[in-house]
Amino acid sequence: MANSLYALVDGNNFYVSCERVFRPSLNGQPVIVLSNNDGCAIARSNEAKALGIAMGAPWFKIKQLQETHGLVALSANFCLYGDLSDRMMSLVAGLGHRQEIYSIDESFIDMSGVRGDLIKRCRTIRERVLRWVGIPCCIGLGPTKTLAKLANHIAKSAERKPGSYPAELAQICNLASLDQAALESVLA
């Protein structure tokens, strides 16, 4: 286990990002995707999160934000999300040895024994996913899947909320490469 290394690649605000691929005019706007029957928010853009919209917020309670803040609410298009997920996962598979698709927008990659500059390798995959599929993603690396998930959370938080974590951990965070003091600081 000491030599194990996993990456977790996770699409950012995945359903909203999928919608923005085909509707770039939505970039920079507060956007949510609603559940079946448009009952509640199941995905939120960073702009919508900044308005305080919680995951699972009932549509009838936040509907007024359309008028007051220009909130765009979209009905879910699961066929579209599945297609873009398939494209993303096929690119992500090239990151390491084995892939375990964890959800529609998350994939664990076994990177144990992969040689070379791992951050550069992750950056290349991240850039390909963005360029070829249109989906922004963050990558977390750790010696276990749980720590890779935590590293991904740190990578997303460092990007979305500057100052919450060191800036160099934004987008791609490798917990396995941090020295003890840096690791303790991040986990505090």
Mark where each language-model region is:
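Gly/Gly-Pro- and Ser/Thr-rich, intrinsically disordered tail segments characteristic of DNA damage-repair
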Residues: 1-188
